[in-house]
From Swiss-Prot:
GO terms for cellular component: cytoplasm. Keywords: Chaperone, Cytoplasm, Stress response. Homodimer. It comes from Listeria welshimeri serovar 6b (strain ATCC 35897 / DSM 20650 / CCUG 15529 / CIP 8149 / NCTC 11857 / SLCC 5334 / V8). GO terms for molecular function: adenyl-nucleotide exchange factor activity; protein homodimerization activity; protein-folding chaperone binding; unfolded protein binding. This is Protein GrpE. Participates actively in the response to hyperosmotic and heat shock by preventing the aggregation of stress-denatured proteins, in association with DnaK and GrpE. It is the nucleotide exchange factor for DnaK and may function as a thermosensor. Unfolded proteins bind initially to DnaJ; upon interaction with the DnaJ-bound protein, DnaK hydrolyzes its bound ATP, resulting in the formation of a stable complex. GrpE releases ADP from DnaK; ATP binding to DnaK triggers the release of the substrate protein, thus completing the reaction cycle. Coiled coil: none annotated. Pfam families: GrpE. Belongs to the GrpE family. Transmembrane segments: none annotated. It is found in: Cytoplasm. The keyword Cytoplasm applies. GO terms for biological process: protein folding.
Amino acid sequence: MSEKKNKKERLADEIEQEELNILDESEETVEEEATADALTEEQAKILELENKLDEVENRYLRMQADFENVKKRHIADRDASQKYRSQSLAEDLLPALDSFEKALATTSDQEEVKQILKGMEMVYNQILVAFEKEGIEVIPAVGEQFDPNFHQAVMQDSDENAASNEITAELQKGYKLKDRVIRPSMVKVNQ
């Protein structure tokens, strides 16, 4: 009987051991599932954070590019402003320059008038030199081909000695500042 008792005890021990093993395995499975869930949650969180980081990096790069564009535009505006800074002054002085030209076109036999005209011519030439220093030039007209970018045709001519579309007379001088026309030349054009 003791042998039977021993067998029963051994059997009970084995069953108990198996139950413990099953419990351990089920606990490990639960722990693995919990760990897998935790990993999945952590991975999802990592993915979410990586996406947010990518989004923030993209925004940063766009803002940096926008800043560079604004900076370049500011430099271009400043350069254009510097390049054409004397345009408004030239526009204001052109009527006075026209008056000088009309006055200098007169002739007189009186010595006093000749002296005054000589002084006016000196002032006129000084203004032209100042214009030249600022990049303001007279637009060539007589003998040139008509160019609507620089000339304004106000009259037509029928001169056989001149080529077609050639400027035969200048009624008012035109001026340009570097590459920008301040005032087009008013001209008479051959047909």
